[in-house]
Structure formats: C-alpha cells, structure tokens
C-alpha cells in the first residue's frame, strides 16, 4: 500500500471521491465534508492533491476557487505549504540522503510525489529557513 492509500485510511472520516468531471484547471476540490479528486491523475499527483485538499480542510474556509482575490491566493498558499511539509518533511529529506538518495528522481520516488513537488517543497524550505 502506498502513501495515497495510507492517507485515505488515516482520514477516513472525510469522503474522498475520484471523479472525471472536475473543471480542467482543478486537480481536486474540497467541499466541506467531501473531497473530489480528478481520477485521471497519476497516483503521485493524487497524493499531492489529497494532501493539499486536507490542508484546506484544516486551515481555510469558504469558496476560494477564484484566485483573483489576494486572500484566496493567501489561503491557497497556506494549504500548499502545509502539503509540502506533510509529504516532504525536512527530516525525511535528510533521512533519504543518508540512505544514499542523491538525485531528484530518486527523491521523488522516495516520497511518492512528482519531481516538481519535491522542487517546490525544497524551495518552500529555502524561503522558510
């Protein structure tokens, strides 16, 4: 079982539905007590989307789909940063290095996320620290 399935089990109190009728620009959507995820995404992207939508459940409120509002973009950033920290914890980057993982591809496989997500996570940590 992978991290996506583990996260689904850990958060079984929230209904997660994989569907194929979300707007093209959305990989997932949090609707109060339900999360919709685009079923056509690769499993790595589903994990990233689930983590971000769970972060929205934890941190934000209301409809923030319209990103033209500064506050909506701010809330989106909060959720994304929490997803980075949950899926690519700093201590686990060190752990991966100590296990002999020295390139982006292997690091993405280690965390079961996309290479892009690993790079964004590292950039987040650079800005944070």
Regions found by a protein language model. Name each.
Residues 1-129:
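Active-site hotspot residues in diverse enzymes, especially metal/ion-binding acidic/histidine motifs
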